[in-house]
């Protein structure tokens, strides 16, 4: 039997996943990180993207989109504190495209009270959602 550890993925709205895993892969600011059992203590800021939780040797895996957050790793527990989190199967492509359109429009139509950083962050998040939707589409064919 493979070694496992406990994983919690939570957002302000709800707990998305709580259970055991063999591996977690998350989009840290410095690059994608893979966490295995007995990993040394680690904390990282997360960027928008996919968190993958490998549950078993059979290949069962959960994919969760996060808009950013924090990753805390202890030897036997991994916690993802996400700004927002959505199960991959629940992502809405039309909503993501609309969010991207609005962010691109805001970036091109700057006004005096324009918040460039916010518009850029919204664009990055929308693009990450669309990449994840496209990845899911390729894997379900």
From Swiss-Prot:
What is the designated name of this protein? ATP synthase epsilon chain
- Keywords, A to Z? ATP synthesis, Cell inner membrane, Cell membrane, CF(1), Hydrogen ion transport, Ion transport, Membrane, Transport
Question: Pfam families given for it?
Answer: ATP-synt_DE, ATP-synt_DE_N
Q: Does the keyword Coiled coil apply?
A: no
Upper lineage: Bacteria, Pseudomonadati, Pseudomonadota, Gammaproteobacteria, Chromatiales
Q: Spell out the subunit comment.
A: F-type ATPases have 2 components, CF(1) - the catalytic core - and CF(0) - the membrane proton channel. CF(1) has five subunits: alpha(3), beta(3), gamma(1), delta(1), epsilon(1). CF(0) has three main subunits: a, b and c.
* Its biological purpose: Produces ATP from ADP in the presence of a proton gradient across the membrane.
**Gene Ontology annotations for the cellular component aspect, listed alphabetically:** plasma membrane; proton-transporting ATP synthase complex
State the organism of origin.
Thioalkalivibrio sulfidiphilus (strain HL-EbGR7)
Localization: Cell inner membrane
Q: Which gene encodes it?
A: atpC
GO terms for MF = ATP binding; proton-transporting ATP synthase activity, rotational mechanism
NCBIfam families this protein is in? ATP_synt_epsi, PRK00571.1-4
Family stated for the protein in its record? Belongs to the ATPase epsilon chain family.
């Amino acid at each position: 039997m493979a070694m496992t550890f406990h994983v919690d993925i939570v957002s302000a709205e709800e707990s998305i996943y709580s259970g055991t895993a063999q591996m977690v892969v998350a989009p840290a600011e410095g690059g994608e990180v893979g966490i295995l059992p007995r990993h040394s203590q680690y904390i990282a800021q997360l960027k928008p993207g996919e968190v993958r939780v490998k549950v078993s040797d059979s290949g069962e895996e959960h994919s969760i989109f996060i808009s950013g957050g924090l990753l805390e790793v202890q030897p036997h527990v991994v916690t993802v504190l996400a700004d927002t989190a959505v199960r991959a199967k629940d992502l809405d492509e039309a909503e993501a495209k609309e969010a991207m359109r609005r962010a691109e429009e805001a970036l091109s139509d700057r006004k005096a009270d324009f918040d460039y950083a916010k518009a850029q962050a919204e664009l990055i998040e929308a693009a990450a959602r669309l990449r994840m939707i496209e990845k899911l589409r390729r894997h379900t064919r």
